[in-house]
Amino acid sequence: MRKALVFLGILALGLAFAQVRTFDQIKKSGEIRIGTEGAFPPFNYFDEKNQLTGFEVDLGNAIAKKLGLKPKWIAQAFDSLLIQLNQGRFDFVIASHGITEERAKAVDFTNPHYCTGGIIVSKKGGPKTKKDLEGKVVGVQIGTTYMEAAQKIPGVKEVRTYQKDPEALQDLLTGRIDAWITDRFVAKEAIKERKLEGTLQLGELVFQEKVAMAVAKGNKSVLDALNKALADLMKDGTYAQISKKWFGEDVRCR
């Protein structure tokens, strides 16, 4: 879903001080530490009872169960997750990171756990295509591929950045921006949750992407364990059940 624009030098610094655990060490502890953001519904967020929930939380719990381990969730700011992963804070991260060539130099990605894309959201009658965005102000979450994509659209008047997606949505509703670019599932969930079907519209996809879990660079034992667990969940029907619970469809990459 999101591809944070991570500085490889910073990640390399994290690698230099890494104390990551092998899968054997994790198994001996009986607990696997999972990093996420906790502010990106419906993928990972805190509900009204302050309980961490979402598609990726359910999937992470299912993976931990498949591995015979107890999950320990740690929520951190999105732009610090991969740095802390390489410092050994987490055993893996599941937080809607899109696979990019740049990031793959600093961390290792599992096989994708879903496919998605960045979509244009606007008020009814507003811009729906990249061409429509000429001369418009576009809102995006900072440090994401949505920001990167918006900056590459010809003719955009201004790309306005926000710490979190709900802030961009609020500015869209109040008319401070003309369009919002975010994950298509996030957009659908926001419109449904806030009953904005009569106010907002979904436009075209700006780009498509594969999303995966991340492990510290070179941590092959954990990477292999996660890939096997994910494949087993996709094969036994658990993945489809979780996916349909949150999206009404199977969102695996085809």
Regions found by a protein language model. Name each.
Residues 72-83, 125, 142-145, 160-174, ...:
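Short helix-initiation/N-cap motifs at beta->coil->alpha
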Residues 33-41, 52-65, 116-167, 184-186, ...:
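Bilobed "Venus flytrap"/periplasmic-binding protein-like clamshell domains
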Residues 58-66, 136-137, 142-145, 210-249:
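Extended ligand-binding regions for polar small-molecule ligands
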Residues 20-22, 145-162, 198-203, 228-254:
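Ligand-binding clefts/hinges and TM-proximal coupling segments of bilobed small-molecule sensing domains
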Residues 114-121, 184, 188-231, 249-254:
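Periplasmic-binding protein-like
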Residues 61, 65, 70-132, 198, ...:
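Acidic, polar ligand-binding/catalytic clefts
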Residues 97-105, 149-152, 173, 178-208:
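A ligand-binding cleft/hinge motif common to bilobed small-molecule-binding domains
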Residues 20-96, 236:
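Extracytoplasmic small-molecule ligand-binding "clamshell" domains
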